[in-house]
Amino acid sequence: MNPTELHMMWMSSQYNAANNMTLEDATALLNHPTVGLLEEMSGHHHQPTLEMNPMMGLVGGDFNGHAATLSGTLPPGTLIATNSNNLYSFAHLGGLQHQLLQQSAAVAAFQNYTEVMDADGMTVGLATDPHGELMDETCDDEDQVYGHQIDDGYDDGGAGLEPKQEIINIDDFVMMNEDNNSYDGTDFMTSSDKDISQSSSSGLTHMQGGGVSLGVAGAEHDLLVPLGDGLMHHKLLGATLAPAMPLNVGNSNVFGNIMVTGADPPSSKQMKGYRNSNSSGTSSATVTTVASTAVMRAQRKTRKIEPVNRPGLVLKTPIAYKGNIDPSVIPIQKDGMAVCERCGAIGVKHTFYTKSRRFCSMACARGELYSLVLNNKMETTGATTSNNQSTSSSPLPAASGTSLDVTEDALLASDQPQSDIELDLHAAHIKNANYRFRITDQSKITQLNSFGEPMSLGGDAAAHNVQMAADETIAALNGAAVGDAAAPGGEANGSGNDTSTPNTASSGYLSAAPTPKALRLFKDVYPQDDLPQIPKYERLPAPCPQMEKVLSIRRRMYDPTHSYDWLPRLNKENFNAAPVTCFPHAPGCEVWDNLGVGMKVEVENTDCDNIEIIQPGQTPTSFWVATILEIKGYKALMSYEGFDTDSHDFWVNLCNAEVHSVGWCATRGKPLIPPRTIEHKYKDWKDFLVGRLSGARTLPSNFYNKINDSLQSRFRLGLNLECVDKDRISQVRLATVTKIVGKRLFLRYFDTDDGFWCHEDSPIIHPVGWATTVGHNLAAPQDYLERMLAGREAMIEVHEDDATIELFKMNFTFDEYFLDGKTNGFIEGMKLEAVDPLNLSSICPATVMAVLKFGYMMIRIDSYQPDESGSDWFCYHEKSPCIFPAGFCSANNISVTPPNGYDSRTFTWEVYLRNTGAVAANQHLFHRVVPEHGFETGMSLECADLMDPRLVCVATVARVVGRLLKVHFDGWTDEYDQWLDCESADIYPVGWCILVGHKLEGPPRVSYQQVAKPAPKPKVPRKKKTKKGASTTGGGAAKQQNDNTQTTQTVKPRTIALKTTPHLPKLSIKLELKPEHHNAAFYENNQPEDGDGDEEDPDPDADADLDADADGDGDGSTSHISEQSTTHSSSDQILGSGSGGGSTSAPVVTAATGSIGGNSNKMNSSATSSKYIPRLADIDASEAAHLELQPDSWNVYDVSQFLRVNDCTAYCDTFSRSKIDGKRLLQLTKDDIMPLLGMKVGPALIISDLITQLKCKVNPGRARSHKTNKSSYL
């Protein structure tokens, strides 16, 4: 196979060419040279970034790896004091060069953190000496102990462990082994560490003399202190310096981070002196920590996550692999895989951070926004850095005065407008429009004192507060409790020797309250809870899919969709519904195993004094606890708690707005009210419920969120795709998604208003570019064809509204055929058995007519006469579950439909193959893996009628043969059964229709069948009725009838119109009904017993019926009675349908003549003549010719009668007043009709289509020509 034939943009996410092909092959594939991977990797130290997978990036794949290299030469030392929330960035910027250099694996762990450049080009990174070399100071034993005290200050016990909110020690944060294939991190910290980890608001500057100076960094930020242990360890201090910040210091930088620089780091002796000047109790505090150091290091080892070592798999974090790994070897399903946009790590999407699951860790999420804003503010930060550096040359005793200078500079810097902050953040969001970090309202960023008033510190007060903050810092470092730091005078240090802080400072410090947590410059995105949790008051659960928008189905007096109600059958003992888990595509299938009998829920209480009339948008106010007794499909039988009998048991859909998990009422402030019948049964209902609910199970708190997510379609309105042409099944046609109901799509063809319904997982829809890729016939606009043909030489130009391959479900991957070199084992001329796509109730011998690419092939059903044009071919994939080896039917006792010219009683494959000289396809070519689907004979379900796919009907599993199901439509003969695969997207659990808001067609009534027995028409052989499979829908009223017009008997069977679908209600003349009568019961109770119908006066409400739903999309749940008059019926045509037409009915003939129906002659002809006035939905062309249909001889009254018998009674008078006779009627166009009807588009389209049908009945050749013109393709 020539690789250049597969330049498809929509295939890019399916394979990883870079890891399976040589560079020469990649060059041939992409038609241009690619990046040399080995050359780039060998020279990676010369580049800050490297594209690890350039070919995938060129093709458009999702897996991009990035690597960052460590700078070999570092400029003089520069240090950044950063927020503890940004600790991943701090790990790179804070000076831990020894860990990074000694452990080579850490380079990959921190590859996403490149050097941050300031305005002058100076690199901000690891601390260095003035000569640009890494600093490696030594220290004495005491200094080393002091450093380890901070690093390993863990408690021996593990009882106080709790999830980390802010990580403090970098040693505890990440440890990489030498094999670079595992990750060591500390997932918990003790409560004492957490106290120290509270964010603060101070920064630290290094001074040339080795001294240190405290600088104000901003609210909720931390102080970076060198440990002086020779390893360049640093420590972030706790929330003890927060009160020392002036009012608006934080405004000088977006995140309050102060950029400070220094010459030489403080020596260990100076650090020791600095500690001793503040406290004499250091030794005891530090020595006690030495013993726990080794113990806690051992404990951290026991908490290490041990990954499974596989060849070629290298972990980046505990939940993600490195980005330069071939995704095909990673043991993660493609639909559950995600790639970190920050570092390129690949992992499970559910474990990623942010709502859109775009980062592998919170560090990547925070670091991205941090770096974006920091780069924008670098110029301002550089100015602040130089100011801080100029003020950091005085020795340690002048710390107070120096701090005051820094404070004044910071105050001056904070005078910039607040709009600068908003502008910077806004610019960051513009550059990364997909980032969804929440920014706190700037108006709330105001520091308050203990009295709730804005703080205004300045002059000496600020100096005293800074000095007090310094004392508190030293106290915290020496082991003093954070709470003790607030004590006056020497008590804060524990020894009483400190006299540097006067009482005024203490009092000033006590008057300032710490900055509230809410006063942060931004908030992080909350990670999703891994396990279902009971919702808390401050975070209510998301509403269920129909929450507060759906009427109570148990008390609904009027159902606008007139759907079939399962309730009468649910109460039968022998009723068996297929479980929801049998339908992989059904909403909630993945969480349905969590539900079970005995589970407690809160449901609406309908047994109360005042039954509420719930309107859309309202929620019931009365609820009570109930127990699930039985589950059938989406329906559940429940009993209120407190009833001892089943007298008040009720059925309810588990996925509607009435059912909630226990505790939902408490979160909404709704009381639990016991049913009125038993309200006096117990004195204390609270104790009763406590006893019943103790140890009971309830719905997961995220149950409705899961249901809602599974209801979301992958498609959107306006997308273009390629789908089977229902008028010519051997070609695909460009169509547009115009409606979506429960993941079912209504596709409208590009050149007509016609279309059909199908599920988004259906195999008859394909992505843009599919036809030109596999070699299938395509009907599309000229510009589309040119774009697709151009894509065969280069990549397809993808438009915004193109449906790409990731939206479609397939049971194979293109990798198998392109990368692995797999070929199609089928060859032309092979014989097999297949489900007839035009008659799903039969399995027939078939012939492979053409072999396409990627496993597709065109087959022809041998039961029909051959069509030289090939219009009867149909495309199947070699892995399709609807094709079988020769002899499959006989081996499974299935009646096979014989080939054309053979008798079903004498047909054998041996004779057939010998007569045709063909070869049967080998059995190993078929994929007949049978999953544990769970279907059994007799199970009830809801199934789409694929002969008219806009209808979803009540059905039963009649037979199970491996993975093949024979679905029987209840109330209809076996002639209308369908053979479907167990994983077909056209079958649904009981209750699916009401869940998604789709109409459910029920079985016909016996009484209604008995009515429909006027003189029968000649029966057409079965095989001539199978054109119904051309995906005919209840589509556009204006054009569908012309597609389905019955031709004469001389036409070849494969070109006849489509057969009748059983699930459409048949209408009599009496159709002008008020909306409240539009239901099945009305028709059943008001049907004349003799089958005749009398004329009825024009009804004023008929206008509304004719106006409604004139767009012709065939949506059965929204259409009205008038649409039934526009869709037609003959012995081989589909009957019109609508919500006003009741559930179902058998075919009936209301057009009457003396030879067809004697009693109805008065309805269909003039009272003064014997002219034949037909009801077009009930005759075919041969009958019209036999009855001498002559509309050009009609008078005005005959035209009025024609409109009346064809369900347009409301406009009879209009045509009569306009003196429209037969000749004038045949000359009318849509533009002529609209002014007559008051510019009503819907009725005009309906009557225009009636006229077109009438012309076709008069001239059958015109009908064939009309249909041929509609089916033309490029």
Swiss-Prot record:
Composition bias, Low complexity: 381-394, 1038-1050
Ranges: MBT repeats: 564-675, 683-781, 789-899, 907-1003
GO MF annotation terms: chromatin binding; DNA binding; methylated histone binding; zinc ion binding
Biased composition (Acidic residues): 1087-1114
Residue ranges, annotated region (Disordered): 266-285, 381-401, 488-510, 1007-1063, 1083-1167
Record key words, sorted: Chromatin regulator, DNA-binding, Metal-binding, Nucleus, Repeat, Repressor, Transcription, Transcription regulation, Zinc, Zinc-finger
Places the protein is found: Nucleus
UniProt cross-references to InterPro entries, sorted A to Z: Mbt, MBT_dSfmbt_rpt1, MBT_dSfmbt_rpt2, MBT_dSfmbt_rpt3, PcG_chromatin_remod_factors, SAM, SAM/pointed_sf, Sfmbt_SAM
Mapped zinc finger ranges (FCS-type): 331-366
Chain sites annotated for binding Zn(2+): C340, C343, C360, C364
Subunit: Interacts with pho as a component of the pho-repressive complex (PhoRC).
Function text: Polycomb group (PcG) protein that binds to the Polycomb response elements (PREs) found in the regulatory regions of many genes. PcG proteins act by forming multiprotein complexes, which are required to maintain the transcriptionally repressive state of homeotic genes throughout development. PcG proteins are not required to initiate repression, but to maintain it during later stages of development. They probably act via the methylation of histones, rendering chromatin heritably changed in its expressibility.
Protein name: Polycomb protein Sfmbt
